[in-house]
Amino acid sequence: MSWLDKLLPPKIKQTDPKSRKGIPEGLWVKCPSCEAVLYRNDVDANLHVCPKCDHHMRIGARERLDALLDPEGRYEIGQEIVPVDSLKFKDSRKYPDRLKEAMDETGETDAMVVMGGAIHTLPVVAACFEFSFMGGSMGSVVGERFARGAQNALEQHVPFICFTASGGARMQESLLSLMQMAKTTAMLTKLSEAKLPFISVLTDPTMGGVSASFAFLGDVVIAEPKALIGFAGPRVIEQTVREKLPEGFQRAEFLLKTGAIDMIVDRRKMRDEIAQLLALLQRQPADALA
């Protein structure tokens, strides 16, 4: 027994590390904005919005779709499509190794989830990026799932909604990923010709090839509060132009002020706001919504 053990009262003893295995981890989360320490269950119940400062944290694709769509009648689109290493690409690591790691961490097979369903009984098709999967980068699978979602909306004659959260085109797929920019915008042209609404919701972050292709092509373009939206990141721009950027540059509020987006909507009100917009765009009475 050490001299310190002799001084400590009997009740103040270091617990056995083996006994700590039953203690659950991740019960608390720190807000990246106000740095408040929050109970994770409260954050989850608040759709990952800080109850102290209203900061919108990042949220998973399926959790977002769960909050958007009615619980009944959902169906997934394009889940059978999986990525392949057509170019045998290798940077610091092999592409298949990166894919496997992302799949294990997220439980998804790529960076987009597409579902058909309804919002307050109004039928829709909704696509959502999974940012945790390789930064939400757009590759062949993301482009194909987006296209199939839009095609399904055409066939069902229902509106199409997309929530973006992406760093841009997927480097590991080179030109195949860049081709998705044209592919996705071409599908939106078909939706426009069919007079079907497309609502684009820009979340943090929406950058690169996604922002440069379909993200701003919505009949209504919505953003979440303080979302980072642009092509190149602010640090890259500052290093290039060698000037300090204005406060809030490339944030949702800046884009609203300059007319690049139509509205900013709190995540907790998103479902109701989109339902109201769909009723308006389809000339349905708003008070008829369930």
Curated annotation (Swiss-Prot):
<keyword id="KW-0443">Lipid metabolism</keyword>
<comment type="similarity">
    <text>Belongs to the AccD/PCCB family.</text>
</comment>
<feature type="binding site">
    <location>
        <position position="31"/>
    </location>
    <ligand>
        <name>Zn(2+)</name>
    </ligand>
</feature>
<feature type="binding site">
    <location>
        <position position="53"/>
    </location>
    <ligand>
        <name>Zn(2+)</name>
    </ligand>
</feature>
<dbReference type="InterPro" id="IPR034733">
    <property type="entry name" value="AcCoA_carboxyl_beta"/>
</dbReference>
<dbReference type="GO" id="GO:0009329">
    <property type="term" value="C:acetate CoA-transferase complex"/>
</dbReference>
<dbReference type="GO" id="GO:0008270">
    <property type="term" value="F:zinc ion binding"/>
</dbReference>
<dbReference type="GO" id="GO:0016743">
    <property type="term" value="F:carboxyl- or carbamoyltransferase activity"/>
</dbReference>
<keyword id="KW-0275">Fatty acid biosynthesis</keyword>
<keyword id="KW-0444">Lipid biosynthesis</keyword>
<dbReference type="GO" id="GO:2001295">
    <property type="term" value="P:malonyl-CoA biosynthetic process"/>
</dbReference>
<feature type="zinc finger region" description="C4-type">
    <location>
        <begin position="31"/>
        <end position="53"/>
    </location>
</feature>
<dbReference type="InterPro" id="IPR029045">
    <property type="entry name" value="ClpP/crotonase-like_dom_sf"/>
</dbReference>
<keyword id="KW-0863">Zinc-finger</keyword>
<keyword id="KW-0067">ATP-binding</keyword>
<dbReference type="GO" id="GO:0005524">
    <property type="term" value="F:ATP binding"/>
</dbReference>
<feature type="domain" description="CoA carboxyltransferase N-terminal">
    <location>
        <begin position="27"/>
        <end position="290"/>
    </location>
</feature>
<dbReference type="GO" id="GO:0006633">
    <property type="term" value="P:fatty acid biosynthetic process"/>
</dbReference>
<comment type="function">
    <text>Component of the acetyl coenzyme A carboxylase (ACC) complex. Biotin carboxylase (BC) catalyzes the carboxylation of biotin on its carrier protein (BCCP) and then the CO(2) group is transferred by the transcarboxylase to acetyl-CoA to form malonyl-CoA.</text>
</comment>
<comment type="subunit">
    <text>Acetyl-CoA carboxylase is a heterohexamer composed of biotin carboxyl carrier protein (AccB), biotin carboxylase (AccC) and two subunits each of ACCase subunit alpha (AccA) and ACCase subunit beta (AccD).</text>
</comment>
<keyword id="KW-0479">Metal-binding</keyword>
<feature type="binding site">
    <location>
        <position position="34"/>
    </location>
    <ligand>
        <name>Zn(2+)</name>
    </ligand>
</feature>
<keyword id="KW-0808">Transferase</keyword>
<dbReference type="Pfam" id="PF01039">
    <property type="entry name" value="Carboxyl_trans"/>
</dbReference>
<dbReference type="InterPro" id="IPR011762">
    <property type="entry name" value="COA_CT_N"/>
</dbReference>
<dbReference type="InterPro" id="IPR041010">
    <property type="entry name" value="Znf-ACC"/>
</dbReference>
<protein>
    <recommendedName>
        <fullName>Acetyl-coenzyme A carboxylase carboxyl transferase subunit beta</fullName>
        <ecNumber>2.1.3.15</ecNumber>
    </recommendedName>
</protein>
<keyword id="KW-0963">Cytoplasm</keyword>
<dbReference type="GO" id="GO:0003989">
    <property type="term" value="F:acetyl-CoA carboxylase activity"/>
</dbReference>
<keyword id="KW-0276">Fatty acid metabolism</keyword>
<feature type="binding site">
    <location>
        <position position="50"/>
    </location>
    <ligand>
        <name>Zn(2+)</name>
    </ligand>
</feature>
<comment type="pathway">
    <text>Lipid metabolism; malonyl-CoA biosynthesis; malonyl-CoA from acetyl-CoA: step 1/1.</text>
</comment>
<dbReference type="InterPro" id="IPR000438">
    <property type="entry name" value="Acetyl_CoA_COase_Trfase_b_su"/>
</dbReference>
<keyword id="KW-0547">Nucleotide-binding</keyword>
<dbReference type="Pfam" id="PF17848">
    <property type="entry name" value="Zn_ribbon_ACC"/>
</dbReference>
<keyword id="KW-0862">Zinc</keyword>
